[in-house]
Amino acid sequence: MAQLGAVVAVASSFFCASLFSAVHKIEEGHIGVYYRGGALLTSTSGPGFHLMLPFITSYKSVQTTLQTDEVKNVPCGTSGGVMIYFDRIEVVNFLVPNAVYDIVKNYTADYDKALIFNKIHHELNQFCSVHTLQEVYIELFDQIDENLKLALQQDLTSMAPGLVIQAVRVTKPNIPEAIRRNYELMESEKTKLLIAAQKQKVVEKEAETERKKALIEAEKVAQVAEITYGQKVMEKETEKKISEIEDAAFLAREKAKADAECYTALKIAEANKLKLTPEYLQLMKYKAIASNSKIYFGKDIPNMFMDSAGGLGKQFEGLSDDKLGFGLEDEPLEAPTKEN
């Protein structure tokens, strides 16, 4: 009975071990490939739990999602004979699920070593061998990533279709310390030069700004002066027009006044001409004699009132020449009076 129990225990252990080795799990984003007796089987499996023959069948999980392969410490000799090292080169790639079997069959499950790592070493050495340290370290460094990606993808398209390179990232290479210090000094001087150039641009920009401000200020002053000059010219023109209008009005008034005076004089002359009739002259004579308070004596006094009209006119004319001949200049002869 003891032997039977031992056999059962051994059988149970063997069964459990067989079951444990037969059941396996494939993670999401991976494809399982199987080997039996060292030969790759054509069947593959997706994510999940699967069974296989225990002890004689083995499997490997191949990632089909994006993965990053790192190639470290890649030596590279430039055309000038300087040895430099790239610390780390990252290659982002993914494998198409349908191409897993062919790639694993041709390049094993560690296909990245044959297709990516070796190719990176080869392409970098070719690139460095035809370029100087200045070009590799500074001038063409930004092109290394894209050149490696294109070269890798071109070879993989013909050698391993289904393996896609998405991106390549290259770190700055390590160069000899003396050369590195020279480059740092050169970069420092270049930075100083750039700073000086930027300062010069700033100064030039400020000077240009000041010049534009001065130009704008001068234009403003000129415009103000032009406007002020225009205003003064308009004021003078207005004053001139006002003066011309006033002069014209004054001339018109004076002319009208002169015309009126001339007209008045003409009318007075015409009226006087019409008034100088014998009857009017005789009336004026009588008024003059009547208004004279002095009495004249002489033989011609009665005749003054008895002359004809023609004689009166002549006497009046003579009187007008001698201030009406009424003795305005000569002293009158007064008759002597007797006192009672």
Curated annotation (Swiss-Prot):
Gene Ontology CC terms: cytosol; endoplasmic reticulum membrane; membrane raft; plasma membrane; protein-containing complex
Gene3D superfamilies: Band 7 domain
Keyword Cytoplasm in annotation: no
Stretches of the chain found on the membrane's Lumenal side: 25-340
A molecular function GO annotation: ubiquitin protein ligase binding
Subunit structure, as described in the record: Forms a heteromeric complex with ERLIN1. In complex with ERLIN1, interacts with RNF170. Interacts with activated ITPR1, independently of the degree of ITPR1 polyubiquitination. Interacts with SCAP, INSIG1, SREBF1 and SREBF2 under cholesterol sufficiency conditions; indicative for an association with the SCAP-SREBP-INSIG complex. Probably part of an AMFR/gp78 and INSIG1-containing ubiquitin ligase complex involved in ERAD of HMGCR. Interacts with TMUB1; TMUB1 bridges the association with AMFR. Interacts with SYVN1 and RNF139. Interacts with TMEM259. Interacts with TMEM41B.
Family assignment from sequence similarity: Belongs to the band 7/mec-2 family.
The protein's name: Erlin-2
Organism: Mus musculus
Phylogenetic lineage: Eukaryota, Metazoa, Chordata, Craniata, Vertebrata
Originating gene: Erlin2
